[in-house]
UniProtKB/Swiss-Prot annotation:
Annotated disease: Spastic paraplegia 53, autosomal recessive: A form of spastic paraplegia, a neurodegenerative disorder characterized by a slow, gradual, progressive weakness and spasticity of the lower limbs. Rate of progression and the severity of symptoms are quite variable. Initial symptoms may include difficulty with balance, weakness and stiffness in the legs, muscle spasms, and dragging the toes when walking.
Organism, as annotated: Homo sapiens (Human)
GO cellular component term, pick one: endosome membrane
UniProt xrefs under InterPro entries: ESCRT_assembly_dom, Helix_hairpin_bin_sf, Mod_r, UBQ-conjugating_enzyme/RWD
This protein's name: Vacuolar protein sorting-associated protein 37A
Keyword list, A-Z: Disease variant, Endosome, Hereditary spastic paraplegia, Membrane, Neurodegeneration, Nucleus, Phosphoprotein, Protein transport, Transport
Location of the VPS37 C-terminal domain: 308-397
Membrane association type: Peripheral membrane protein
Domain of life: Eukaryota
Lineage, uppermost ranks: Eukaryota, Metazoa, Chordata, Craniata, Vertebrata
Summary of subunit composition and partner proteins: Component of the ESCRT-I complex (endosomal sorting complex required for transport I) which consists of TSG101, VPS28, a VPS37 protein (VPS37A to -D) and MVB12A or MVB12B in a 1:1:1:1 stoichiometry. Interacts with TSG101, VPS28 and HGS. Component of an ESCRT-I complex (endosomal sorting complex required for transport I) which consists of TSG101, VPS28, VPS37A and UBAP1 in a 1:1:1:1 stoichiometry.
Length: 397
């Protein structure tokens, strides 16, 4: 019964065309960006037409896919990186840049949205793992290949790093050569910390070791007393006493115990034993407080795990609600509701034609349903015009 009240068709769909004044390369770039937006509604625009970020969570691990479009895109392939660095067969050795064949073989006719979707599908099929000892952020010490220096990462949750020198090298400090090789076997190399702010101007501490003190495996040393080349007290002994000392070990040991150097060693040993016992008693006194703090850390870690799980569930719920309230979803609901109102009005008209309804009841109910139908159609057309207008300026609804 739509012939009773013909509906006017909106001509707003023509407004979605490409804006004038753009070259074919720029139009292709906009089409690829639109493909990326349409394929992934949760993508965030960091810098218009330059940088985009897509977060996703897998196995309680949240990963940000950063998509950087070079100036000559799509003639140049995009630079796709992830943070934090991960281990996966589609990533490079550092776990930062995507080396997928779809990215390496990118052409201006490729579909960027499908490339990112295939990357996500591969991550879901073969979940990645965090890269070990990943302290450096992408682009910290060197520019990636194929990326111009004009673009910045602009991550809001990290402090900005100052520009690094291109020829900067990271060297490790070594202790003095007098340290035995056994000491180095018990030490592990520490990753170089990134320098930023005023900390880069501070001097690094250089460990020093006294070459005159032999060092043991635990890093502590003891300076032995100087042993003289001659013992003047032996000159006061007779030949028979010297002979007895040479032949009898007890006499030699008795004379040896009277040496001041040995007495000094015994005194130092006793002092060291006393200091060790005192330190052990202090450590035992600290045990209850350390155990309490350890339990507190465990409780807070458990609370952190629970809050993280709750946060991820709420983020998933927020994403679902955001999808349900998007412009395309609202437009679909309006279209269905308008169609339902139109069907109800058609049924009322058929009942009237069959004589099942009085004319007064027909006019009131039929006009009410048709008014609702026309209102919903008008809202749908207005929403379509708004979507077409915003799509020209690349602003996602």
């Amino acid at each position: 019964m739509s012939w009773l009240f013909p509906l006017t068709k909106s001509a707003s769909s023509s407004a979605a065309g490409s804006p004038g004044g753009l070259t074919s390369l720029q139009q292709q770039k906009q089409r690829l960006i639109e493909s990326l937006r349409n394929s992934h509604s949760s993508i965030a625009e960091i810098q218009k037409d330059v940088e985009y970020r897509l977060p996703f969570t897998i196995n309680n691990l949240t990963i940000n896919i950063n998509i950087l479009l070079p100036p000559q895109f799509p003639q140049e392939k995009p630079v796709i990186s992830v943070y934090p660095p991960i281990r996966h067969h589609l990533m490079d050795k550092q776990g930062v840049y995507v080396t997928s064949p779809l990215v390496n073989n990118f052409t201006m006719h490729s579909d960027l949205g499908k490339i990112i979707q295939s990357l996500l599908d591969e991550f879901w099929k073969n979940p990645p793992v965090l890269a070990p000892t990943s302290t450096a952020f992408p682009y910290l010490y060197s520019n990636p290949s194929g990326m111009s220096p004009y673009a910045s990462q602009g991550f809001p949750f990290l402090p900005p790093y100052p520009p690094q020198e291109a020829n900067r090298s990271i060297t490790s400090l070594s202790v003095a050569d007098t340290v035995s090789s056994s000491t180095t076997s018990h030490t592990t190399a520490k990753p170089a910390a990134p320098s930023f702010g005023v900390l880069s101007n501070l001097p690094l501490p250089i460990p020093t070791v006294d070459a005159s003190i032999p060092t043991s495996q635990n890093g502590f040393g003891y300076k032995m007393p100087d042993v003289p080349d001659a013992f003047p007290e032996l000159s006061e002994l007779s030949v028979s006493q010297l002979t007895d000392m040479n032949e009898q070990e007890e006499v030699l040991l008795e004379q040896f115990l009277t040496l001041p150097q040995l007495k000094q060693i015994i005194t130092d040993k006793d002092d060291l034993v006393k200091s060790i016992e005192e330190l052990a008693r202090k450590n035992l006194l600290l045990e209850p407080s350390l155990e309490a703090k350890r339990q507190t850390v465990l409780d807070k870690y458990e609370l952190l795990t629970q809050m993280k799980s709750t946060f991820e569930k709420k983020m998933q719920r927020q994403h679902e609600l955001s999808e349900s309230c998007s412009a395309s979803a609202l437009q679909a609901r309006l279209k269905v509701a308008a169609h339902e109102a139109e069907e109800e009005s058609d049924n009322i008209a058929e009942d009237f034609l069959e004589g099942k309804m009085e004319i007064d009841d027909f006019l009131s109910s039929f006009m009410e349903k048709r008014t609702i139908c026309h209102c919903r159609r008008a809202k749908e057309e207005k929403l379509q015009q708004a979507i077409a207008m915003h799509s020209q300026f690349h602003a996602p609804l």
